Amino acid sequence: MVVGDFPIETDTIVIGAGPGGYVAAIRAAQLGQKVTIVEKGNLGGVCLNVGCIPSKALLHASHRFVEAQHSENLGVIAESVSLNFQKVQEFKSSVVNKLTGGVEGLLKGNKVNIVKGEAYFVDNNSLRVMDEKSAQTYNFKNAIIATGSRPIEIPNFKFGKRVIDSTGALNLQEVPGKLVVVGGGYIGSELGTAFANFGSEVTILEGAKDILGGFEKQMTQPVKKGMKEKGVEIVTEAMAKSAEETDNGVKVTYEAKGEEKTIEADYVLVTVGRRPNTDELGLEELGVKFADRGLLEVDKQSRTSISNIYAIGDIVPGLPLAHKASYEAKVAAEAIDGQAAEVDYIGMPAVCFTEPELATVGYSEAQAKEEGLAIKASKFPYAANGRALSLDDTNGFVKLITLKEDDTLIGAQVVGTGASDIISELGLAIEAGMNAEDIALTIHAHPTLGEMTMEAAEKAIGYPIHTM
């Protein structure tokens, strides 16, 4: 404590107000804690401000732009369709502002004290919060660290005017004529798709043998096919070597198949992963144990090696997903309350908003076989679903992974429009230990895309109606 600085007492202090932090603060407050949340930027964190939400707004606008140009088969003929990208950005910002304002209202409604500034730990029971004008010490009984992550900057690709990260891409004020994307993961693939829809000439440079490495090849094939139809060039096993800004753009040098090549573009978007924000918090001095790559070690209650300090979200091992952070947030808050809550990721989905959408939960077919499990894989195609046909969008499938012995659902994959929504039912089924018959006997509304989970389940038990 600094002389003259009177510390403020609080039960639980949360550092970071993203989808992990603000959820943790609200749940802790609901459980009777006096809660303070510290945020150095905007409430909502990366997800609401420069991540999940604005990227989906841009993607939605890009879909509408494409649909306006290509709906002749539906009898909708639009001539001279144009794009006002400034309006697109205004729409994106309006969505972000509504949600961030909503988060502030929820925090205040739950009597959470909101503090703006940067925090670092003084000891196991106090931290210092500083802004541009002042500093304040807070004493706490428990702390939850939810500081998220930031884009990785790779050698010779220093972020600037033309070399941008995902935040820069989301805030562009023009549609690039040419865009190079370094990294073919979900961020690069989603943003590459959006700008291709807006009219950019997109090249994706991926260092691995394939893009979207977190998904099965069977799932990514339709995505790659769709990208190529949009004119997106995908270069795999490509090593990005340097980016040199020019007067009007950027020159990217990369190596592929032993040959060095260059490509000129208006911008290069670097999406090669994210780094946890665990530095500059004073954690090393406290003796908090770290895992690999700057992540923090935690137990099943999200507790670090220091018993009253918890960590959630992108700063702990596992996929950097907003819904994972929110889930861990509730577990941490309930653990502080003395409950026996523990994390269990068995029903946690992962989604990618490409075209078509990708979603997976539990075991993939390959993972189950690698573990020596005796399984069945049962697929139902979008092309056999009435709702998909009426939407003129039949590219995709629903696949269930069940155990041969009792048809218990242990995994599911969905490719196609609405996959990100369909997967939730299948995650619930896995979480509840349901088998294929449980899903098959559940009456699903007709005509809906959700019926395909029932159809795939009927195939799993050997009695398919609308497929052979």
Swiss-Prot record:
GO terms for biological process: 2-oxoglutarate metabolic process. Its EC number is 1.8.1.4. Binds 1 FAD per subunit. It is found in: Cytoplasm; Membrane. One of its GO terms (molecular function) is dihydrolipoyl dehydrogenase (NADH) activity. NAD(+) binds at G183, G184, G185, Y186, I187, E206, T271, V272, G273, R274. Keywords: Cytoplasm, Disulfide bond, FAD, Flavoprotein, Membrane, NAD, Oxidoreductase, Redox-active center. It is a peripheral membrane protein. The active site is at H446 (proton acceptor). Its cofactor is FAD. InterPro entries: Class-I_Pyr_Nuc-Dis_Oxidored (IPR050151), FAD/NAD-bd_sf (IPR036188), FAD/NAD-binding_dom (IPR023753), FAD/NAD-linked_Rdtase_dimer_sf (IPR016156), Lipoamide_DH (IPR006258), Pyr_nuc-diS_OxRdtase (IPR001100), Pyr_nucl-diS_OxRdtase_dimer (IPR004099), Pyr_OxRdtase_I_AS (IPR012999). Gene3D superfamilies: 3.30.390.30, FAD/NAD(P)-binding domain. Lipoamide dehydrogenase is a component of the alpha-ketoacid dehydrogenase complexes. PANTHER family: DIHYDROLIPOYL DEHYDROGENASE, DISULFIDE OXIDOREDUCTASE. Belongs to the class-I pyridine nucleotide-disulfide oxidoreductase family. The active site is a redox-active disulfide bond. This is Dihydrolipoyl dehydrogenase. It comes from Staphylococcus aureus (strain Mu50 / ATCC 700699). The lineage of its organism: Bacteria, Bacillati, Bacillota, Bacilli, Bacillales.
